[in-house]
Every structure is written in structure tokens, then in C-alpha cells.
Amino acid sequence: MNMSVLTLQEYEFEKQFNENEAIQWMQENWKKSFLFSALYAAFIFGGRHLMNKRAKFELRKPLVLWSLTLAVFSIFGALRTGAYMLYILMTKGLKQSVCDQSFYNGPVSKFWAYAFVLSKAPELGDTIFIILRKQKLIFLHWYHHITVLLYSWYSYKDMVAGGGWFMTMNYGVHAVMYSYYALRAAGFRVSRKFAMFITLSQITQMLMGCVINYLVFNWMQHDNDQCYSHFQNIFWSSLMYLSYLLLFCHFFFEAYIGKVKKATKAE
């Protein structure tokens, strides 16, 4: 492949972004993610209690706008971080793409890495619509939101290896997922296979997360300076991704395979 095709061009706002200030801010403030998570949990239980006594809100137009905004953000994030990761993969190889800390402070990706971790706080707003519209709130939904927020803020401050893969995969899956949510909220009929594809993509993402953690753990044993992380981070990350993998597999079975079996028996 012609490497000139993969040459990265920065936009002005990406060039002007000061990653040192961003990393310093996160080092000083990452524990606020626990406060956000606590307020989020309080809203879930308090909101559900309050909504038991009143009719649901429709909120179709705000939901379309919300989902579309996150879809556009995720699409741009996926394109920019994806271009950077592809460039590193093609020019320096897999190990460098996993271990290199330049994803946090390099051209193009530095802005989108910080935007990613910050976005995990407003993304908690997804649940507001579920509560106010009195839809079913499953454990996977709020567990995933809380743990991603906590882990991303905790990891960004240390610029740990593997972050580029984690963030790029998440951007990509969210680009598809929020586009699907926007279409559904707007009243479009979307094939059930599309929803299945999204869940399978999430399962693949979690499986890849486990693989990346294994690679980081293996490579850091030989050269921690070139593949920087620490055991505590890998432990929490592995536990998180493994729990996601099991929960998404269970969700896939219950939502798609289990329903098909029940429908077949009913016939």
C-alpha cells in the first residue's frame, strides 16, 4: 500500500489542542468521575421512583437530536482515530500500535483521545431518556456507562498502552449504534439484523479488548518503557472487558436466539 495515501493531515483545532494541559487536568480531576457516577446512580433510582407515579414523556424529537449528535461525534472520532491507528499499523506494526503512547499526545489523535474520555460523562444522558420514557432499564446499560466513565478517566491520566485500540474501537461501534438509535427515534423501520450486527460488533469489541490486555501484559514484562502500563490497570481493564463480553453474549442470546426459540415453540 502507498504510505502517502495514509499521510495524516491535521485540522487547525487539532493542532491547537494542548494535550499537556488536558493530561494534567485529568491527573488532578479524574476522581470526579466517582462523583458523576454516584449522581448518575442516584438519578436512576430516584428517577424511576418518581416516574412510577406519572405518565411517560414522549421526547421523540429531543432523542433524535441527542442520538444524532452522538452519532456525528462518534463518526468523526472513528474516522480520525481510525486513520491514525491505520497509519501506525501500516508503518510501524501491531506492537507499536498497541504500546505507543503517542495516541495521547501525537498529531490528530491527541484531541480525539481527550474528547473521548470527556464524552463519557455526557453520554450518561442516554439513561435520562430511558427513565423519562419509562423504558426497560437493564443492568448492562448502566453498569457499562459507569465503568467506562471510571476506567477511561482513570487510564487517560497515565497514558497507558492499549488506549488507542480501546478508544478507536469504541468510537467505531458507537458511530453505528447511535446512528441506529437516531433512525429508530425518528420513526424509521430498521431491520432487526442491524440490531444484531451492532450487538455482535460489541461482542467483538470486548473480545478484542481482552486480547489487547493480554498483549500489553505480555509486552510490558519485557520492556515496560516501550509498552507502558501497570498491573493494576491491566487487572481492572481485563475484569471490565471480560464482564462486558459475558454480559453482551448473554444479552445477544436473550434478545435474539432466545426469542427465536420461544417463537418457534409457540408456532
UniProtKB/Swiss-Prot annotation:
Provide the protein name: Very long chain fatty acid elongase 6
Please list the tissues where expression of this protein has been recorded.
Expressed in liver and barely in brain.
What is the originating organism of this protein?
Rattus norvegicus
Q: What does this protein do?
A: Catalyzes the first and rate-limiting reaction of the four reactions that constitute the long-chain fatty acids elongation cycle. This endoplasmic reticulum-bound enzymatic process allows the addition of 2 carbons to the chain of long- and very long-chain fatty acids (VLCFAs) per cycle. Condensing enzyme that elongates fatty acids with 12, 14 and 16 carbons with higher activity toward C16:0 acyl-CoAs. Catalyzes the synthesis of unsaturated C16 long chain fatty acids and, to a lesser extent, C18:0 and those with low desaturation degree.
Q: Name one GO cellular component term.
A: fatty acid elongase complex
Instruction: Just give the chief location class.
Output: endoplasmic reticulum
> Membrane-crossing residues?
34-51, 70-90, 111-131, 136-156, 159-179, 197-217, 234-254
The membrane topology term of the UniProt record is: Multi-pass membrane protein
This entry's Gene Ontology molecular function terms read: acyltransferase activity, transferring groups other than amino-acyl groups; fatty acid elongase activity
The EC number(s) this enzyme carries: 2.3.1.199
Any one Gene Ontology biological process term? very long-chain fatty acid biosynthetic process
Enzyme class, spelled out:
transferase
User: Where is the organism placed in the taxonomic lineage, from the top?
Assistant: Eukaryota, Metazoa, Chordata, Craniata, Vertebrata
Q: So, what pathway does this thing act in? A: Lipid metabolism; fatty acid biosynthesis
Under catalytic activity, the entry for this protein gives: a very-long-chain acyl-CoA + malonyl-CoA + H(+) = a very-long-chain 3-oxoacyl-CoA + CO2 + CoA; hexadecanoyl-CoA + malonyl-CoA + H(+) = 3-oxooctadecanoyl-CoA + CO2 + CoA; (9Z)-hexadecenoyl-CoA + malonyl-CoA + H(+) = 3-oxo-(11Z)-octadecenoyl-CoA + CO2 + CoA; dodecanoyl-CoA + malonyl-CoA + H(+) = 3-oxotetradecanoyl-CoA + CO2 + CoA
The protein's recorded glycosylation sites are 2
- Extract the InterPro entries matched here: ELO_CS, ELO_fam, ELOVL6
Q: Which UniProt keywords apply?
A: Endoplasmic reticulum, Fatty acid biosynthesis, Fatty acid metabolism, Glycoprotein, Lipid biosynthesis, Lipid metabolism, Membrane, Transferase, Transmembrane, Transmembrane helix
Its subcellular locations are: Endoplasmic reticulum membrane
Q: Which domain of life is it from?
A: Eukaryota
* Pfam families to which the protein is assigned, alphabetical: ELO
Q: How's its activity regulated?
A: The reaction is stimulated by the presence of HSD17B12, the enzyme catalyzing the second step of the elongation cycle.
